[in-house]
A protein has these predicted regions:
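Short terminal targeting/anchoring segments and short Lys/Arg-rich nucleic-acid-contact patches
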Residues: 1-3, 15
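A residue-level marker of the well-folded mature domains of exported/periplasmic proteins
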Residues: 3, 8, 23-329
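C-terminal segment of classical bacterial N-terminal signal peptides
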Residues: 13-23
Length: 329
């Protein structure tokens, strides 16, 4: 029976381990951007589910206490010393992690990135939660659908080096002129997936742009912070908050009207898929363009020319369904 226990790395870092039975033959590290984030906690549940299905797998769930590349580098060095079999990482910086991950691969450790990617030379494959262009369009559409006359919107992202959010924002910017000409993107700010900083950045946007109609936050931390700012500032009906959110964390803001709709994929499936992919690499399956990989009950993926694949399309949550999904994740 797998269970959670604490893995102490340093006084500045925290981690939890989902420990398999003593007979476990594979150690797979699920390295996240930061601990204490509901999205990654849900992914860890999926990782545990995959380990149970596969059998003989020990999942180490770990990450820094704040979303920094430096924190992840320290953790990866510790995992190399532990001689884990695979590292599956959601990165805080696509380039800064490459040297330490190359070191891991040189030691025979399999490396994949998921959610937030690592540069190709620092991993063997990458699993996107969804198609990048589709996510970019979705986050804009979530705002535009409730702005028939158009208007000013701003984006509150995670860190300025976050691979996934930067790609989604770039995709959003590209489709604005063609598909959403009435939407005016006035600013992009960064809350570093920290609730206090995200709150301050949201307040700054509202103060700096008095005609702001929507805040788009493609981060589960930032979207909650922005919705709380709108709620506390009596701005419901004036500023709509949308983006990517966990239904369980965000239901109250759909209910009170500070948000009309948000989207996300299933983070449980994402962590589950990361473990399945790592397990297959450990077993000798080669990551190369065109290669097909099973991700268990989630389905199958095919790697593209960059050894990347997407898991699923984003799903929209609004008043009609958020009650149901808030009970799941």
């Amino acid at each position: 029976m797998k269970f959670l226990k604490t893995l102490a790395l340093t006084t500045a870092l925290a981690a939890t381990m989902m420990a398999a039975p003593a007979m476990a033959q594979e150690k797979i590290a699920l390295v996240v951007k930061s601990l204490g984030n509901g999205f990654f906690d849900a992914a860890a549940k999926g990782a545990e589910n995959a380990a149970k299905e596969i059998g003989g797998v020990e999942v180490i769930y770990t990450g820094p206490t704040s979303a920094t590349a430096e924190g992840q580098i320290e953790i990866i060095n510790s995992l190399i010393a532990q001689n884990v079999n695979a590292i599956a990482i959601s990165s805080n910086d696509p380039d800064a992690l490459v040297p330490v991950l190359k070191k891991a691969m040189d030691r025979g450790i399999k490396v994949i990135s998921w959610d937030s990617g690592v540069a190709a030379e620092g991993r063997q494959m990458h699993l996107n939660p969804s198609d990048t262009n589709l996510i970019g369009e979705t986050i804009i559409k979530l705002a535009a659908d409730y702005l028939p006359e158009g208007g000013d919107v701003a984006i509150l992202s995670a860190s300025s080096t976050a691979t996934n959010q930067n790609a989604w924002i770039d995709a959003a910017k590209k489709i604005l002129p063609e598909k959403f000409p009435k939407i005016n993107l006035v600013s992009v700010v960064y809350g570093d997936d920290d609730s206090v900083k995200s709150t301050n950045e949201a307040k700054g946007l509202i103060s700096s742009y008095p005609n702001l109609k929507a805040i788009i936050a493609p981060t589960t931390v930032g979207v909650v912070a922005a919705a709380q700012v709108v709620t506390d500032g009596n701005l419901i009906g004036k500023v709509n908050v949308t983006g990517l959110a966990l239904p369980s964390e965000f239901k109250q803001f759909i209910d009170n009207g500070s948000s009309q709709a948000v989207a996300l994929w299933n983070p449980i499936d994402l962590g589950y898929s990361a473990v399945y992919l790592s397990h297959q690499l450990i077993g000798g399956t080669e990551a190369k363009p065109g290669a097909k990989f099973s991700i268990g009950k989630v389905g199958e993926i095919t790697l593209d020319d960059t050894n990347s694949a997407a898991m699923a399309a984003p799903f929209t949550f609004d008043k009609s369904n958020i009650e149901e999904f808030s009970k799941i994740y």
